[in-house]
Amino acid sequence: MITQTLEMNQEDQTASYQMIKEEHLASLVITSQTLAGSRVLKSTYQQVVFSDCVFYAVEFQGVVFDNCVFENCNFEFSHIRRCKFKNCSFVNCTWKATSTIDTVYADCTLDSFLSRLTESNGNEMAFSFDIALQIAA
C-alpha cells in the first residue's frame, strides 16, 4: 500500500490531499472519515462499512469494492472511473455533481440518484438470480 499526503498551507487555511494506491482493507467499519481532493487508485475493499464518510472531490480509479456498505456518505464532486462494485449497497448518500464512468455495479443495491448516474458513460449493471426448479419424480 502506498499512501502519500500532500499538504497545502495558504494563509489561515490548511488542506491535506492523499494519494492512496494499492490499499487492501477487509472486514472493517470506517466511520466519519473525510477525504477531500484525494485520489484512490487500484485498491481493494472487502466487507467494509463506510458510515458518515465524506469523499469530497475524490477520484476513485480502478478500485474494487466487494460486499461493502455505504451509508450516509457524501460523494459530492467525486469521479468514479473503471471501478467495480460487487454486492454493495448505498443508503442515503449524496451524489451532487458526481460522475461514474466505465464502472461495473454487480448485484448492488443503488439509491435512485446513483441508479440514474449509471445509465450512461459506459457503466454496466449486472444482476444474478438464483433459480430453483423442482423435478417431478
Q: What are the roles of these predicted feature ranges?
A:
Residues 2-137:
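Tandem repeat scaffolds
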